[in-house]
Amino acid sequence: MKNMTLAHITEVCGGTYFGPEEKKTAEVTDIVTDSRKAGEGSLFVAIPGERVDGHKFIPNVASQGALAVISEQTLETPPCPYILVKDSMEAIKAMAEYYMPVSYTHLRA
């Protein structure tokens, strides 16, 4: 299993990190989009949806021990470190591609 620190994730997602410098080297234990599943060491990805905007759950995940969040919005008073990105879904895709690179060399066209 690859170690993914907040610094790695910030780079992979092309985002901007906001938070204490010492937290950048902390390793993420899991990545979640469901705020109810966030816990100690989690990275919560806030996704704006048609009915519910995941950004409204950021205070909840911070109180549950989440290490950080990925947000499309600038947080005025962040309850925990966060990575600002242009598109949360693209950030998830970038993290997945980094974590589990796919090789298509075995396919014939």
Feature map (PLM): residue ranges:
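Short, basic phosphate-binding NTP loop
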Residues: 2-108
